[in-house]
Amino acid sequence: MRLTVVGANGRMGRELITAIRQRKDVELCAVLVRKNSPFVGKDASVLIGSDSLGIRITDDPENAFSSTEGIVDFSHPQASLLYADYAAQKKLVHIIGTTGFSKTEEEKIAEFAKYTTIVKSGNMSLGINLLANLVKKAAKALEADDFDIEIYEMHHANKVDAPSGTALLLGQAAAEGRNVMLQDVRINERNGYTGKREKGSIGFSCSRGGTVIGEHSVIFAGSHERIVLSHTAQERSIFANGALKAASWAKNHANGLYSMLDVLGLNDQF
């Protein structure tokens, strides 16, 4: 499957290029960077320090998408919406690992998915999606009157959105387990005099610092006992390989908006 990597000079863009070279089910077709990037016109090998790849870096989406079958996208919300539009028009698979979308932007992506196959997830790793599966089951088994749910995450100093897309994915799994809407029970932060904790609420707390790739814990706190389900990402390659697995899967599926739970066959297990 021929793929275009967008945001190719970012952390995940470089990881994706490296991962594609190591797989047989996908091949690198084009790499796209922001307008007037100093990388434009150079061989894509400069991004990963390898031998020549024979692919010139471009800042022109039309050029980047002209002969591709899919777009792999870890960029930012505004750019992802633009690429989703291209994908819908050209019937290209679109894999979205971007986070930080507003409700309106989420709705636009769902609309584009009527015309092409989109896989969108706050985290593309197998481990996190298995964790979400476990969180949903635990939330269903542990009643709100007996167990409080808190979600903690830490990322590197340069991450710009909070809570992370992964934390929200885990919060959504917990809310679904308890048959409630996350927006109705979500507590984003606590500061000053907050009063007692509301029964059934799902709290989020975030830390930023250093080069932490990603740490997430979901805490079920009851009387005299505490259950902690957690995941630590040690390399970004887990996200890249998950995204490429999603691309290969999406190629053979109908138009629609899917998640990594669909790709991994975990939705049926909830």
UniProtKB/Swiss-Prot annotation:
Gene3D superfamilies (UniProt xref): Dihydrodipicolinate Reductase, domain 2, NAD(P)-binding Rossmann-like Domain
Pathway, per record: Amino-acid biosynthesis; L-lysine biosynthesis via DAP pathway; (S)-tetrahydrodipicolinate from L-aspartate: step 4/4
GO molecular function, one term: oxidoreductase activity, acting on CH or CH2 groups, NAD or NADP as acceptor
Subcellular localization(s) per the UniProt record: Cytoplasm
Record's GO cellular component terms: cytosol
One Pfam family recorded for the sequence: DapB_N
CDD domains: DHDPR_N
Annotated family: Belongs to the DapB family.
Name this polypeptide is given: 4-hydroxy-tetrahydrodipicolinate reductase
